[in-house]
Amino acid sequence: MPFLPINKQEMIQANIIKPDFVFVSGDGYCDHPSFGTAIIARMLERFGYSVCILSQPDIRNFKVWLEFGFPRLGWLVNSGNIDSMVNHYTVGKRRRKTDSYTPGGIIGKRPDRAIIKYCNEIRRVDPNGAIIIGGIEASLRRLSHYDYWDDTVRKSIIIDSQADLLVYGMGEKTIIEIADYLASGLKISDLIFIKGTVWKTKDISLIPNSAIKLPSYDLIRTDKKTYAESFMIQYNNTDSITGKPLCEPCQNEFIIQNPSREPLTREEMDQVYDLPFMRTAHPLLEKIGHIAAMDEIRHSITINRGCYGGCSFCALTMHQGRVIQSRSKDSVIREAKQIIADPEFKGYIHDVGGPTANFYQPACDKQLEFGVCSNKQCLHPTPCKNLKVDHTDYLDILRTLRELAGIKKVFVRSGVRYDYVMYDKNDDFFRELVQYHVSGQLKVAPEHVSDTVLDLMGKPHKALYDRFVKKYFQLNADLHKEQYLVPYLMSSHPGSTLNDAIILAEYIRDIGYNPEQVQDFYPTPATLSTTMYHTGLDPRTMKPIYIPKSQHEKAMQRALIQYRDPKNYALVLEALTKANRFDLIGFGEKCLIHPQR
């Protein structure tokens, strides 16, 4: 199956006179199932709709919007696989030097706040065209939200973008329903009933009777306590079974969030990943320059989506939901055989997983009938008694992949949830993970070691991680392997004081670890942690918490994790002095730094 058209010449070659949809994306067009643009476009194609891709249009050029003419049914707009502001800026708000989703890594080929800019330009050239926005940037900004880069609460992106309809979450079924209704003759303004969408109205009579009324934009913009309360209502209404419609007044309009789209069945997941992807970047874009984002995912396999891990700093609950959706073994093997047939395949499957590699089934049987629990998490602070812990099916897939002709090694790199591994009374998965699926080092995410901070993060306590580490190295010894463990660590998370950061530094000292990279907490839209950062409250309890907000303190906490780096000496010295931890300044084996000369 050829690539979808990215210019007028290709549109003509595809015998398209007037496309049903023009898909505007902030990414370079890669026809691979790891890219939402490719999935949605191929789904539409499967159901008989024509789609042309307008990849990274230059908003300064008026003519770019006329490349395919105006679409018959509507414009589809996303910023790409990543929020455009996260894509462009570090947590320190410095401009990044490269863009992995752009040919040649060139930064600036998409604008800041890409969806807003794209839609405003489309509205200028096609005032009556239907505009539908989706993807991560739209999904996580679907209602009023704290924006770290402006340091203020912004309105729903459907207001600022002038879009007609917003698709949130994973939109395969939603976009087909929208397309079918538009094709039947309904106007975009009629589509106020579709699950997994957000719409706006000035007509109070259109608001569903069952809708929960949220505090207004003006109120949450000025009152942090109200902001936290509003966020928790949103957070607890992400489930397709238990979730209610939400209504947020925004000045002279109302923003309505319809209930979430139901999770895909296994058969539906297979249909998505069996679509005829080319599995690489469009050749015209490759001529301009390599798209680095393809490197890791080209020979990787996604087997699931959704996550019930409940990490506070993660947006998965708000975007993909807590119900695990997974593919069948047959579907995974079919994709593996496609990868093996790639002339550039060297025998190594880079990854087999998803948001959490070893979540292959829903957390419990009741989720599919009654929905997820709104008043508790599956794993934190302790695992629910109804949690099903079973790696059997995932392990069966890995074993089958290992035996395929042409495969030398199958790696698992996409976030093994170590607590779930430890809760499994059967060691087969852990043993085979260590024996066959680690590429020299296993990356896991304890994130911190202070239990106070871990509770705010929604992560298991340090004691469980210590048990995991011990067992990991024992298995390596039993298997006569010398493999390492790389812990992901986060500095400056809400609730983390200098004393907590020092506890983490002491742990790093004690295990002899020298981290090359540190993730400073990044307040991205629609997470619990970002709400903590903005409000100074834990929205689950409404109790005040300490927030390391100044760039200087964040730099000190980050430096403590890398205290061995001579460049960090002054910051580490200042942090230890502020915390009165002079016992860690000296020449003893427990000291972090030497005294100043």
Predicted regions and their residues:
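Conserved, mostly hydrophobic/aromatic
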Residues: 164, 272, 311, 332, ...
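Terminal amphipathic helices with adjacent charged low-complexity linkers/tails
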Residues: 60, 189-238, 252, 261-264, ...
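Cysteine-centered iron-sulfur cluster-binding motifs in ferredoxin-type domains/subunits
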Residues: 300-313, 322-326, 331, 335, ...
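N-terminal pre-triad scaffold of radical SAM enzymes
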Residues: 24-27, 288-315, 348
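Glycine-rich beta-alpha loop elements in corrinoid/cobalamin-binding modules
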Residues: 36, 55-250, 561
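Radical SAM enzyme core and accessory elements
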Residues: 2-6, 221-261, 268, 274, ...
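Conserved SAM/AdoMet-binding glycine-rich loop
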Residues: 23, 39, 54, 58-59, ...
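Flexible glycine/acidic-rich beta-alpha junction loops that bind and position SAM and/or redox cofactors
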Residues: 83-92, 140-142, 172-177, 202-205, ...
